[in-house]
Structure formats: C-alpha cells, structure tokens
A protein has these predicted regions:
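Helical segment within the ABC ATPase nucleotide-binding domain
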Residues: 192-204
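ABC-family P-loop ATPase nucleotide-binding domains
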Residues: 40-47, 97, 102-165, 169-177, ...
Length: 237
C-alpha cells in the first residue's frame, strides 16, 4: 500500500526586497491586493510573505486543486513542495518520489548535448545515473529529436525541442507525487497527443496530484479537493 504523504504546518515563505525605498514600499503595498503580503520589520528590511502560515495534510488518493488569483501563492507552494524554495518557518514533511512539471528546463545546461541533459535533468530529479542509463533509449525515442540533435548542444534547439526533451525525461519515471502548474501542452499537434496520453498515465498512476490552475473545468475534471489561496493564505479548503 502506498504511504506517500505531504504534511505542512504553519509554513511561511518570504522573499526579501533589498534596497527598497519607502516609495517603492508604498507602491508594493498598493499592489498587495494581487500578491503576497508586503511588510517591513524593525530594522526596516522589506519582504514579501508569499505563503503565510499554510497548513494541510495530503494523503494517497488526493487530487488537490490550487486556485486563486495571480500571486495568491499557488506556484510558490508548488515550488516549495518541489524543493526549489525553503520555508523560513513552519514544518514540511514529504514522503514519496516527486515529479515536478512546473519548471521543466530546471537543471538543463545550454552548452551540454541533449544526451548529457537527459542525465543532468534526471539527476536533478533525484534519479540515479544507472536508472537513467536504462531509460536512455526510451527517453530519446519519445522525444523524437533524433540522433543528430541529441548529440548537439541544447542551445541549438528551439524552445519546443527543449520542452520535448525535458518532458520526455520528467515523465519517464514512476511518480508518487505529481506537481503541475496548469496542464502541460507540449510541441505540435501530433506530439502533443502522445504527450497528453503519457501525462494522463503519469497522473493516474500517481498517489497524489497537486495541480495549480485558473481553469475551473480543469480543476473540476482532475481534482477531488480544492484549496483556495488569497494573499499567501488558504482561505477555503
């Protein structure tokens, strides 16, 4: 039985704003209705509180939809779960292999070849080199980039080609926990069709899905729990 889970208690994420003038602070405060909470501490250091005492418990079978306006904290939470951002307060426990589909190009090197980037992206995701080596052919085949391009630096790729490669690597392993910011669309119509099929399989086989979206239909179709964010806080669960 899958024992994956995500437990958060009073998680806080703040981003410091260096050299912020009083005028820029006032402007930030005026914009606060569409973002996190802006504040200055006793030493006049300005920071944006992107997540403010967020708590939840995700269990196997949960399909979580994160909703809210731009800057509400949805993507910040996904990046915290992916290990990109660290909380400044509170506790976060994650058990299970995470596949993050929010920053597909993360860990890729523009000067390295496509083949080298398969390993770089895979290692960044926590996959052992031996496991990547076993999947190398199937990843290359799924990307449809061909031998010539896979032996070239990815700086020579179009954005679509790079996305194909990153997607092929990211969805090549079993995921206990899947993190998504909207539903991915990859490449031309033909490639996108098989990418959508694979993505559906990855999500179906996962224990927990966390999906941030502005589309009520997408959330309704794929999620069984909804967390509504406002100014970095969960206002409805």
């Amino acid at each position: 039985m899958n024992q994956s889970y995500i437990r958060a208690k009073n998680v806080v994420v703040e981003f410091p704003i260096y050299n912020a003038s009083h005028r820029s602070l006032r402007k930030s405060l005026m914009r606060a209705t569409t973002g996190g909470r802006v504040a200055a501490d006793a030493s006049k250091r300005v920071s944006v509180r992107a997540l403010d005492n967020v708590s939840f418990d995700f269990k196997p079978g949960d399909r979580i939809g994160l909703v809210g306006h731009n800057g509400a904290g949805k993507t910040t939470l996904l990046r915290v779960l992916a290990g990109v951002y660290a909380p400044v307060a509170g506790s976060l426990e994650v058990k299970g292999r995470i596949v993050s589909l929010i920053d597909l190009s993360l860990g890729m090197d523009q000067e390295a070849t496509g083949y080298e980037n398969i390993f770089l992206r895979g290692i960044m995701m926590g996959i052992k080199p031996k496991e990547i080596e076993k999947k190398l052919y199937s990843i290359a085949e799924f990307s449809e980039l061909g031998e010539d391009f896979l032996n070239m630096p990815v700086r020579t790729y179009s954005s679509g080609m790079m996305l194909r490669l990153a997607f092929a690597v990211s969805t090549s392993i079993h995921a206990d926990i899947v993190l998504m910011d909207e539903w991915l669309s990859v490449g031309d119509a033909a490639f996108n069709e098989k990418a959508t099929e694979r993505l559906s399989q990855v999500v179906e086989n996962s224990s927990i899905l966390v999906l941030a979206s502005h589309s009520p239909k997408l959330v309704e179709k794929n999620c069984n729990r909804i967390l509504t964010f406002q100014h970095g806080q969960i206002v409805e669960a």
